[in-house]
């Protein structure tokens, strides 16, 4: 899939109605936004469109999971207040995203007006399926989805997409707005630029760090990475499946993925055939339970982890070796932490890896830190500005790394 798409910087926005898909799926508590990071992320694109003389900007987003009907707690109205504060100008909230009330609400607007539509997922047509007010599963017909998409399209002259986090979803607002110019906002453009560097033009040695609980969750990712990388670190809970399968290691109460174990030998043979060097942990920090107050211990591959304990982090020898591997890489993809970094007793391995990636970044190494847990590591240690890129889309970034086609990107105009 080509990642070179039309950028907002190459679109004439003067006197145009700009229809912009954003990701304002923000955390809420008691009707208030508790984290504005995603709103802040979209603001450069919104401000740029205003500066370039856009007639109006129509913002559309989802909030919450699959809905299919109007649910008060998922209203985007409180988000509009935060957007207004950030822009320093009024943002008119519209109580629906399509229909006569929406179009009438935009009439007689002054130049540079900003509108925020109500939650797209209040309409079952956005995702194609949802839940009725009485709790029954419902589906939209293709004709209904098409009509919904066309009604959204009528609200703009130019379509911008800055919602990388939903780029892997073939939802109406992502793929159905068939305006002549369909461009990336700055946030989307940044994501695509970094992934293009990583996947199409990587500098070598190219290293992938892949963690997570289950091997079976990362099958497609590992398979695709083996075609691209020079070295691969297998870490986190999934490492125990490799170690038990390959070395008959005693892993105690550690995670073991039986379905994933069935393909470990095949992967090792594939890696060997492609001259990819695989690195696995050699020692561990263990705990007698999955809890902050666990009694800790240490273990090595031989004699293994005792029956009462589980491996919850990489040990010092492991991290010394992994950091050496990181230090010689020129391109790094990191998807999955070294251990249970949310618990301080088991955060040392991930922190050591983060420090090594930060050090590599200062030397010009391109790196992408994606996956929900890995992306969370950066705010924990305040390293967002010290690494090349922290992806804003967990599912979207994983599917790109897996080599999949993303509907929301395919729908954009080519550069």
From Swiss-Prot:
Residues annotated for CDP binding in this entry: 212, 217, 236, 336, 341
One GO BP: gluconeogenesis
Keyword Iron-sulfur on entry: no
GO function term, MF aspect, one: ADP binding
Catalytic activity: (2R)-3-phosphoglycerate + ATP = (2R)-3-phospho-glyceroyl phosphate + ADP
Top-level division of the source organism's lineage: Eukaryota
Binding-site positions, ADP: 212, 236, 341
Cellular-component GO terms for this entry: cytosol
Key words, A-Z: ATP-binding, Cytoplasm, Glycolysis, Kinase, Magnesium, Metal-binding, Nucleotide-binding, Transferase
Entry EC no(s): 2.7.2.3
UniProt-annotated location(s): Cytoplasm
Annotated residues for binding of (2R)-3-phosphoglycerate: 22-25, 37-38, 61-62, 64, 120-121, 168-169
Family to which this protein belongs: Belongs to the phosphoglycerate kinase family.
Name under which the protein is recorded: Phosphoglycerate kinase
Lineage of the organism: Eukaryota, Metazoa, Spiralia, Lophotrochozoa, Platyhelminthes
């Amino acid at each position: 899939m080509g990642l070179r798409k039309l950028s907002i910087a190459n679109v004439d926005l003067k006197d145009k109605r700009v229809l912009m898909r954003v990701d304002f799926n923000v955390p809420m508590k008691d009707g208030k936004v508790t984290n504005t990071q995603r709103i802040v992320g979209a603001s450069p694109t919104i401000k740029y469109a205003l500066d370039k003389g856009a007639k109006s900007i129509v913002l559309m987003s989802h909030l919450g999971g699959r809905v299919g009907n109007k649910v008060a707690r998922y209203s985007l109205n409180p988000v509009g207040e935060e957007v207004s504060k950030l822009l320093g100008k009024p943002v008119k909230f519209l109580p629906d995203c399509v229909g006569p009330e929406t179009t009438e609400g935009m009439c007689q607007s002054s130049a540079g007006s900003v509108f925020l539509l109500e939650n797209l997922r209040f309409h079952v047509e956005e995702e194609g399926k949802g839940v009725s007010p009485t709790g029954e599963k419902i589906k939209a017909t293709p004709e209904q989805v098409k009509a919904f998409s066309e009604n959204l399209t009528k609200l703009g002259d130019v379509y911008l997409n800055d919602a990388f986090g939903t780029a892997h979803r073939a939802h109406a607002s992502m793929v159905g707005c068939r305006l002549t110019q369909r461009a990336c906002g700055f946030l989307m453009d940044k994501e695509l630029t970094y992934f293009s560097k990583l996947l199409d033009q990587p500098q070598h040695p190219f290293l992938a760090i892949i963690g997570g609980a289950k091997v079976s969750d990362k099958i497609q990712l590992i398979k695709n990475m083996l075609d691209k990388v020079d070295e691969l670190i297998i870490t986190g809970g999934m490492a125990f499946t490799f170690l038990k399968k390959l070395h008959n290691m005693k892993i105690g109460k550690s995670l073991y993925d039986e379905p994933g174990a069935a393909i470990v030998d095949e992967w090792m043979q594939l890696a060997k055939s492609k001259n990819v060097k695989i690195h696995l942990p050699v020692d561990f920090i263990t705990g007698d339970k999955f809890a902050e107050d666990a009694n800790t211990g240490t273990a090595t591959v031989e004699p293994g982890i005792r029956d009462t304990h589980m491996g919850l982090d990489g040990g010092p020898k492991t991290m010394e070796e992994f950091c050496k591997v990181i230090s010689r890489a020129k391109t790094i993809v990191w998807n999955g932490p070294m251990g249970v970094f949310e618990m301080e007793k088991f955060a040392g391995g991930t922190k050591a890896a983060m420090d090594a990636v930060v050090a590599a970044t200062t030397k010009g190494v391109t790196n992408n830190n994606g996956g929900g847990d890995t992306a969370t590591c950066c705010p924990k240690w305040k390293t967002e500005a010290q690494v090349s890129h922290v992806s804003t889309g967990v599912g979207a970034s994983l599917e790109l790394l897996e080599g999949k086609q993303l509907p929301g990107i395919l729908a954009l105009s080519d550069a």
